[in-house]
């Protein structure tokens, strides 16, 4: 693998270990040219998923986009990065298990919301406010009312 610091073509793997959920391998690498060290992550990719957006356009599934949206929703909440990685790995596996090459963005949003509602209601509300495009305080109130009614069932 090419060194991200100096561009040298051949780096050495110093340490490899699976992540806690065994969904990927973390490798610690060293560059013999500049002596820099860096970490890489290796995952199995069954197929390239294409996301169909609301406007009909298509783009390659961007796992980091899901990670960032969860980090924003879970900011200052008692959830660490490893838990976020496990959530995203689970969502990605569910999408791949559908057997489809194309998935609607709405499905990804719903999967994220399904995880968040059982995990952290504040994060669920934060995510929903962006995902459902809340424009005013009334939208929050309406949504909280629906959450309360669902909890009563």
Swiss-Prot record:
The lineage of its organism: Bacteria, Pseudomonadati, Pseudomonadota, Alphaproteobacteria, Rhodospirillales. Residues 49-139 form the ATP-cone domain. InterPro entries: ATP-cone_dom, NrdR-like_N, RNR_NrdR-like. This is Transcriptional repressor NrdR 1. Binds 1 zinc ion. It comes from the Bacteria. Pfam families: ATP-cone, Zn_ribbon_NrdR. One of its GO terms (molecular function) is DNA binding. It comes from Paramagnetospirillum magneticum (strain ATCC 700264 / AMB-1). Residues 1-23 are annotated as: Disordered. Residues 7-23 have a biased composition (Basic and acidic residues). Negatively regulates transcription of bacterial ribonucleotide reductase nrd genes and operons by binding to NrdR-boxes. Its cofactor is Zn(2+). Keywords: ATP-binding, DNA-binding, Metal-binding, Nucleotide-binding, Repressor, Transcription, Transcription regulation, Zinc, Zinc-finger. Belongs to the NrdR family. A zinc finger (unnamed) spans 3-34. One of its GO terms (biological process) is negative regulation of DNA-templated transcription.
